[in-house]
Amino acid sequence: MAVKIKLARFGKIRNPQYRIAVADARNRRDGRAIEVIGRYHPKEEPSVIEIDSERAQYWLGVGAQPTEPVLQLLKITGDWQKFKGLPGAEGTLKVKEPKPSKLDLFNAALAEAEGGPSTEATTPKKKKAPAKKDAPAEAAEAPAEAEAAAESDAPAAE
């Protein structure tokens, strides 16, 4: 059975996305695949190329023939050079820089705005005003405490 490593297209119109598939050479482009070993998204910047290197090496080793576009992708990832024993097995794949997490962005914005994140609410809670009945009782207790303190000082002076 002639086996090819080829691109199986899926995705929207004008936004092609491909699976890198190992399939019988007689099957149609998007037909049944023996195994999917990677993916290729050419419209993203830089293009997303993910190939399972171990499986690609296996299929190349058992005689699967890559199509021309897949051969170029294998050269970019370095799998073709590794298979042939050529120098440059590290490949020339460009990788997108990871995006900072939303939590990191939030903490950076807080640090810039106020000096650091806080665990409290952003607006202070309103304190309840003491009830009017409690206010005179507290006022009455305060002079009583002062009188008691004065009485305790008086016997000590005698």
Swiss-Prot record:
GO terms for molecular function: structural constituent of ribosome. InterPro entries: Ribosomal_bS16, Ribosomal_bS16_CS, Ribosomal_bS16_dom_sf. The keyword Ribonucleoprotein applies. Transmembrane segments: none annotated. It comes from the Bacteria. One of its GO terms (biological process) is translation. Residues 112-158 are annotated as: Disordered. One of its GO terms (cellular component) is cytoplasm. Keywords: Ribonucleoprotein, Ribosomal protein. PANTHER family: 30S RIBOSOMAL PROTEIN S16, SMALL RIBOSOMAL SUBUNIT PROTEIN BS16M. Belongs to the bacterial ribosomal protein bS16 family. This is Small ribosomal subunit protein bS16. It comes from Mycolicibacterium vanbaalenii (strain DSM 7251 / JCM 13017 / BCRC 16820 / KCTC 9966 / NRRL B-24157 / PYR-1) (Mycobacterium vanbaalenii). The gene is rpsP.
